[in-house]
Design a protein with these regions (language model features):
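A glycine-rich helix N-cap at a beta->alpha junction
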Residues: 75-88
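Acidic/glycine-rich phosphate/pyrophosphate-binding loops and surrounding catalytic core
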Residues: 94, 98-118, 122
C-alpha cells in the first residue's frame, strides 16, 4: 500500500526523521530495536538474511525502478512516498538510491556461535566512525570474510 507523504509530523515517519541511532537501537527494549537500510541492494541483502521490514520510504521515481521487485514481495508493509526534494527535507540527507527501509533488528548471535563454523573472521575493536566501519565491511567482503565481529567495548567481550 502506497502512502503519499502529506504530513511531515506523522508519527509513522519518526523512524526516518526524528529518531536518533541510539533511539532506534533501543526502540523495542529489551528486544532488539530498528535499523535503517538504504538502497534496494542493501535492503534486499538484509531481507535475504532474515530481517523483517517495518516500512519503506521510497522516492516516487523508484516505485517503478529498483524498488519495485522488493515492494512486490511485501504487499502488506507500508510504503511512504514523495518526490526527492521532500524526502531530503524529511530525512535531512540525500537518498543516494531512492529507497530506505526501517527493519527490525534480529537478536545478535554470541561470539561462540559466530566463531563455531567460520574459518575467516575479521574483528573490529573500538572502531566507531561510520565511514571507517563501512570501508572495513566492504574490504572484509572483498577478502571473503565469513563473519565480522565489531567490539565497541572490548572489556565486555568474554570468550
Amino acid at each position: 500500500m502506497f502512502n503519499e507523504i502529506k504530513d511531515f509530523a506523522a508519527p509513522e515517519l519518526d523512524v526516518y526523521a526524528r529518531t536518533s541511532e541510539v533511539q532506534l537501537l533501543r526502540y523495542y527494549e529489551p528486544e532488539p530495536g530498528i535499523f535503517i537500510a538504504e538502497s534496494p541492494k542493501v535492503i534486499e541483502r538484509a531481507l535475504n538474511a532474515g530481517y523483517q521490514p517495518i516500512s519503506f520510504l521510497v522516492e516516487h521515481k523508484d516505485l517503478e525502478g529498483g524498488a519495485q521487485e522488493i515492494l512486490k514481495q511485501y504487499p502488506d508493509v507500508p510504503v511512504y512516498t514523495a518526490e526527492y526534494e521532500l524526502l531530503v527535507k524529511l530525512t535531512g540527507f540525500a537518498l543516494t538510491r531512492g529507497m530506505l527501509c526501517a527493519m527490525r533488528r534480529n537478536p545478535l548471535p554470541s561470539v561462540e556461535e559466530i566463531c563455531r563454523n567460520a574459518s575467516r573472521i575479521a574483528v573490529l575493536e573500538n572502531v566507531v566512525n561510520p565511514t571507517n566501519i563501512g570501508a572495513i565491511f566492504r574490504s572484509a567482503a572483498a577478502l571473503h570474510m565469513l563473519s565480522l565481529i565489531h567490539i565497541s567495548e572490548p572489556t565486555r567481550l568474554r570468550c
